Regions:
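Non-catalytic terminal segments and appended small domains
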Residues: 1-170
Length: 170
């Protein structure tokens, strides 16, 4: 199947409604049903629970708790490298950021200004830099770690369409 045909349903389905429904289900305390769902997910995507601080699947009350599980100490030692990824995953795209350059993320084009919530001055500070798009598969650990000290000074909500993340759209 071509990439266009694989992505087409994402334009036709009610993305916000489906995302809200998935969020409610992921946060639901379903007892044995939640445990069965997590167990099936671990098996299907070959999730390495030995890396988790708590490898007991039955101890996660919600799918969100499982999905954002902490790692055990020492599971991700920092490499002595010039570049360290803050997440598990694979680099799906990498390139230079130039004035008004638009680059791909999730199969769609964005400008740096759009990616920082419409702040043109902030977007311009990235000109001359580089970007990397990191694809996290379902089996990947989904927390972000910074290999350096820092302080979060502000957060910006960036509205937009919600698209499935998979190798076709990554």
């Amino acid at each position: 199947m071509s990439d266009t045909l694989a992505v087409l349903p994402q334009y036709l389905l009610p993305k916000k409604l489906l995302t809200a429904l998935a969020g409610k289900l992921a946060g639901a305390h379903g007892g044995a049903a939640t445990t069965a769902l997590i167990r099936r997910f671990v098996k299907r995507y070959n999730v390495n629970m030995a890396e988790a601080a708590n490898p007991d699947i039955a101890s996660y009350p919600t799918f969100n708790d499982f999905f954002t599980r902490p790692l055990r100490a020492g599971a991700r030692p920092l490499a002595a490298a010039d570049f360290i990824s803050p997440v598990d995953g694979a680099i799906s795209q990498f390139g230079a950021i130039e004035k008004d350059q638009i680059f791909q993320a999730k199969g769609h084009s964005y400008s740096t200004t759009a990616l920082v919530g419409g702040d043109a001055a902030l977007g311009a500070t990235f000109n001359g830099g580089s970007f990397a798009t990191l694809y996290l598969s379902p089996r990947d650990y989904h927390r972000i770690h910074m290999p350096c000290d820092g302080v979060l000074r502000r957060m910006v909500y960036v509205p937009g369409d919600l698209f499935s993340v998979n190798p076709t759209t990554a």
